[in-house]
Amino acid sequence: MPLPLRVWSKVAALSVVAAFSLPAAAQSAGDNIVNVGWFHLYTDDSSQTLMRTSPSPGPVAGSSASVGDADTLGIAFTHFFTDNFALTADLGVPPKFHLDGGGTLAGLGEIGTAKQWSPALIAKWYFGDKTSKLRPFVGLGATRVWYSDVQLSSSLQRAVTAPYNGGVSGTATADLSSSWAPVYNVGLTYNIDERWSLGFSVAYIPLDTDADITGRNAAGTVISRHKTNLTLDPYVTFLSLGYKF
């Protein structure tokens, strides 16, 4: 005999309640998760006065530089050793930073660009249990930072060579020092279903680099050397989509 309509209505309602009462899929021991998303790097930057080390050592009075923000594609791989403890390897396409002259160098405009490589390994503690749909976390790790494709603008090259080359512009190159730095990380993961999740995190990296600029004339002879220190101290946000396997 067919069930009355009111019985079917109750069955449907109970099914909906049961579906929403199921434990939310989340991360647990042994899980591996790949996240792909957007890194935004906001630099809390500053710089020391540009110093001339040769010839006639001395400061370039009133000089400074600033480093702009950057965006890039981010990739992270996370392995859960327990339901709460995980290690994450953060990678990504190296972001390109733009440097602008400040103070007495402001008239030069953009003075250079560089790509930053900063793979990181972060230990994370996830709060809640493996059935939690929303899981905040804290993390602490380390990153190795180095730079490539360092390019100086023609205006800066002229500024650091022409005064020592009879007013004729030469060429200049720059080396940026590599370093290790700690990574402080907080964030949260929202589990959409058994496999997919959304992630958002903020990391702070206390970071600086020494810049050494070498000027040469047309014959390749070194005619000037300058140096400065740039503080970057970036805050890095990461908005991503994760897949568990």
Where are the predicted features?
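Transmembrane beta-barrel strand/turn architecture of Gram-negative outer membrane proteins
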Residues: 120-122, 183-190
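Short loop/turn motifs that connect adjacent beta-strands in outer-membrane beta-barrel proteins
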Residues: 25-31, 84, 128-135, 192-195
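Short sequence motifs at beta-strands and strand-loop junctions characteristic
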Residues: 65-71, 113-118, 174-181, 229-233
